[in-house]
Amino acid sequence: MIYRFLLLVMLITVGFPRPLKAEVTTDGTILIITSYNPETRSISDNLSAFMDEYKLRGGKRLITIESMNCKNLSEAHLWKERMASILEKYERTAAPSLIILLGQEAWASFISQNSEIAKKTPAMCGMVSANTVVLPEDSVDLVKWSPDSKDIFKDFPDYNIVSGYVYQYNVDKNIELMRRFYPNMKKVAFISDNTYGGLSMQAFVKKEMKKYPELELMLLDGRTSSFLEVSERIRHLSNDVCVLVGTWRIDCTENYVMGNTTYMLRDANPTLPVFTIASVGLGHWALGGYTPVYHKVGKEIAGATYNFLDGETGSETGVVPVPGNYVFDVKRMHQFGLDSINLLKVLS
């Protein structure tokens, strides 16, 4: 079911601060489309930050919120139509002055549209990766699907993307990190789960690994393997393999895995060197990695929204990459005999 929320209803429903009672204008409505129900914590936190900042800056435009209510990857063939239905509704009534997409699934569904409202209306995005995949036709088997990775900075010139805050995953820096510590590495095992985010990240890693023909890429794919099957494969990985963890929430059974399953994966092969590209496994399994600095982007998007719609110059912020940094688990590194001198070499 697709939910539609007006700003006043939304603020009351999920406990946001009291709404503006005066000087709200319906001219140039802002349409926010989320991947999940707005009561989901990650969505709620970003919406709350957006509302607070937009109000603080003096924004007075009516904000309408729609949820695509996305769930498992197996229903991805439905997302394009859900997005089309939302956009058609506004195209028939009053087209918004700005569309904001929050979440990977909403963003992918939007850039998979060919309608005039999708391509011409100014758009912003948040809670998304700089690299994505365009949704397939209904007939595609999602378990076997091997999509091309697309880059928001290069591949969508026919869309009116005026701003966004995107996470950039850096395969090169993680390969360099692995080689600093394990110069004899010959294989990289990449772990991804049965989600759109996992598939999108896998497509990007496959694309980037073409730069390293001397390294064999092994895919531990939650679309085709259960937790137990992935665990068994990890158990038998050889000592010339480094693991790069992407995402791990849902396996092929479409059941959400518990947080402690990464502990069990660790215990399946305790001496296996593991790194992370997205912070998954830090604190108990991964030695470290180069990852985005995750944070709520609602405030920044509100600022970009106000500047674009209400600022004196109508300025476009452009798509902004969220910074990344190196993160390490010093305790795990000591357990593997990797000392601080090696750390300094990496960061120099």
Give the positions of each predicted feature.
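N-terminal signal peptide c-region/cleavage motif recognized by signal peptidases
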Residues: G15-P17
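N-terminal secretory signal peptides that target proteins for export/translocation
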Residues: M1-I2
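Cleavable N-terminal signal peptides
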Residues: V9, P19-L20
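Sec-dependent N-terminal signal peptides
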Residues: F5-T13
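Short hydrophobic alpha-helices and adjacent helix-cap/hinge residues
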Residues: L20-S348
